[in-house]
Regions:
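Bacterial N-terminal signal peptides that target proteins for export
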Residues: 1-8
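N-terminal signal peptide c-region/cleavage motif recognized by signal peptidases
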Residues: 15-18
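Structured soluble/peripheral alpha/beta segments that form catalytic or ligand/cofactor-binding pockets
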Residues: 21-346
Length: 346
């Protein structure tokens, strides 16, 4: 029995139908018994870079848009998810996702593990996150541990080793890191490091490619981040010429886009929160037998933003246990830039 099958067997044994009913960790289920985010959070670093086992779900989520020495654009994803299967926090499971996107190909990897045996985990000081041989590890000799990272992952047909250096501060979404996700008040704790300069090496079927570009790390944890009626989301992280950044998302229910939010981030890390974000699908593509909106119009009137985003590769489908679309995009219009789009529930 191979390692992935063993991991999947463990996962399905530990994860009840209820937990899996709304995607990873049952994101829309009641949080009864688990810790819940509260307004006016007080973060403590580096401790809060580490896990919070009394919350149901948590992730360390990095994406990067890279330019190769061959002139091509590439995208990279590295994600580690943690889920507590009981409120006591004594039964944890971990899931890792990695992706490499080129204009013509998309490579996906997935790892599954249970906690407490060393196969996967996160430490806050020194900072390290890992599952099997995939790792995100601090290289910082002073300051915040996330200021400098090394990232590694190996997939069936691709691999990467990347060094990341932050040239800006951590930023906090919502109200100082308390990020509301619905009109009913479901929320998460959510902060990011959106200012990474990235360089390193991709290993692809065509050969090794040296790359450099920009990266974005999201840190988020909660116990019920979605309303029970919400079944999908569309999430953007964009970096614009001139240095401003945008994090924006829309959450969907049967009536359509039910809740939106945006963080407008200046070059010095100042965040302006807004709920006037408008997301409009412009073009759909048949991906994995589904109609997926791969080009979007994004409007944020409070910042004079009106842009169109276009996918680098329509086929950026993560065919994982809980499948979704994740890939690099370019932005044009009132602002020019690039970034990442994640879509679930299609």
């Amino acid at each position: 029995m191979n390692a992935k099958l063993i991991g999947l067997t463990v996962w399905l044994t530990l994860a009840s139908t209820a937990v899996m009913s709304q995607g990873f960790a049952g994101l829309g289920q009641t949080a009864e018994g688990y810790a819940v985010p509260t307004p006016e959070p007080s973060f403590s670093f580096p401790a809060d870079h580490g896990p919070h086992p009394d919350f149901r779900v948590e992730w360390w989520y990095l994406t990067a848009v890279l330019e190769g020495e061959d002139g091509e654009t590439y995208g990279v994803q590295w994600t580690l998810f943690r889920s507590a299967l009981r409120p006591e926090g004594d039964v944890q499971v971990w899931m890792g996702h990695a992706g490499v996107t080129t204009p013509d190909e998309h490579f996906t990897g997935e790892r599954l593990a249970r906690g407490e045996i060393g196969q996967a985990g996160v430490t806050s000081q020194p900072f390290a996150a890992w599952i099997d041989d995939w790792s995100m590890q601090s290289r910082a000799v002073e300051g915040d541990p996330l200021d400098a990272l090394q990232l590694r992952a190996s997939l069936d047909q691709a691999a990467y080793t990347l060094d990341l250096n932050a040239n800006g501060p951590l930023v906090f979404h919502g109200d100082k890191g308390f990020s509301i996700k619905s009109n009913s008040g479901q929320a998460s704790y959510y902060y990011s490091q959106p200012f990474y300069e990235v360089k390193g090496l991709l290993r692809l079927p065509k050969g090794d490619v040296e790359v450099k570009g920009q990266g974005w790390l999201d840190r988020e944890w909660s116990s019920q981040p979605l309303d029970a009626d919400q079944f999908g989301w569309d999430w953007f992280s964009l970096s614009f010429e001139g240095g401003n950044r945008l994090m924006g998302f829309g959450l969907r229910d049967v009536s359509g886009m039910s809740f939106t939010y945006a963080s407008w981030v200046t070059l010095d890390g100042e965040v302006t929160s807004s709920n006037d974000l408008r997301l409009t699908p412009l073009r759909t593509a048949q991906v994995a037998g589904r109609d997926v909106p791969v080009d979007w119009r994004i409007e944020l009137p409070s910042q004079g933003l009106d842009i169109t985003t276009s996918a680098l590769n329509d086929e950026s489908w993560q065919a994982t246990l809980f499948p979704y679309w994740e890939g690099p995009v370019t932005a044009s219009g009132t602002h020019e830039g690039q970034g990442y789009l994640e879509m679930t529930g299609y």
